[in-house]
């Protein structure tokens, strides 16, 4: 095919050498340009990255990709989250009097000192009644919630839409905590009195 085109060009050549040379140059120039415009036209559809204006396109692609990933991760995490988070919250909260009392010395001075203050700030407004009255329960609750929040923060770092669940998980933790806290209230009456005296 290419040689036949050349043959046609060569046949035209004797007509006017100069015109043919110009035409050959033009067609030669046009052909790569054609393929370029084709590849440019097709490449943004196939892969926006090699497009002439990378910033806007890559940003668009990145945003779309991130959105897709976040949606996928959010769906996965909502499926994972709603089952394990419930069980994790319930598991973390129900043994909260015993289990997290052991954890709290490790947790409080250790990792989440800034996290702890944030958690306390987050916890104070909503379960004020429970946290203020039950000091011993407050510590396990916060540590358990801190662990949950740390997990959520790691997820949040990956997926901003995870903001959906942290409001949920404190609410869940309050509901699931309410029972251990009530049991703990009966156990911790003396320390409540001590707190009130202090």
Swiss-Prot record:
Biased composition (Low complexity): 35-46, 56-83
Keyword Zinc-finger set for record: yes
Biased composition (Basic and acidic residues): 179-198
GO molecular function, one term: zinc ion binding
Biased composition (Polar residues): 95-105
Ranges for region Disordered: 16-111, 152-198
Cellular location(s): Nucleus
Any GO BP: segmentation
Keywords: Developmental protein, DNA-binding, Gap protein, Metal-binding, Nucleus, Repeat, Zinc, Zinc-finger
Coiled-coil stretches noted in the UniProt entry, renumbered to this chain: none
Zinc as UniProt keyword: yes
Cellular component annotations (GO), alphabetically ordered: nucleus
Biased composition (Basic residues): 17-31
Job description of the protein: Gap class segmentation protein that controls development of head structures.
Family named by the database record: Belongs to the hunchback C2H2-type zinc-finger protein family.
Name of the protein described by the UniProt record: Protein hunchback
Organism of provenance: Drosophila lineosetae (Fruit fly)
Upper classification of the organism: Eukaryota, Metazoa, Ecdysozoa, Arthropoda, Hexapoda
């Amino acid at each position: 095919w290419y040689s036949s085109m050349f043959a046609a060009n060569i046949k035209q050549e004797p007509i006017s050498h100069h015109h043919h040379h110009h035409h050959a140059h033009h067609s030669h120039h046009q052909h790569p340009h054609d393929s370029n415009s084709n590849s440019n036209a097709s490449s943004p559809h196939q892969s926006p990255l090699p497009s002439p204006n990378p910033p806007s396109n890559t940003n668009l692609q990145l945003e779309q990709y991130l959105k897709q990933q976040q949606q996928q991760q959010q769906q996965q995490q909502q499926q994972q989250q709603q089952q394990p988070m419930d069980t994790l919250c319930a598991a973390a909260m129900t043994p909260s009097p015993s289990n997290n009392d052991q954890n709290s010395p490790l947790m409080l001075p250790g990792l989440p000192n800034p996290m702890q203050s944030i958690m306390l700030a987050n916890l104070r407004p909503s379960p004020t009644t429970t946290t203020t009255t039950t000091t011993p329960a407050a510590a396990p609750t916060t540590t358990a919630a801190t662990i949950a929040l740390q997990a959520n923060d790691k997820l949040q770092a990956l997926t901003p839409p995870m903001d959906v669940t942290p409001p949920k998980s404190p609410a869940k933790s309050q509901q699931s905590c309410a029972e251990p806290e009530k049991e703990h209230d009966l156990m911790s009456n003396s320390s409540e009195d001590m707190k009130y005296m202090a």
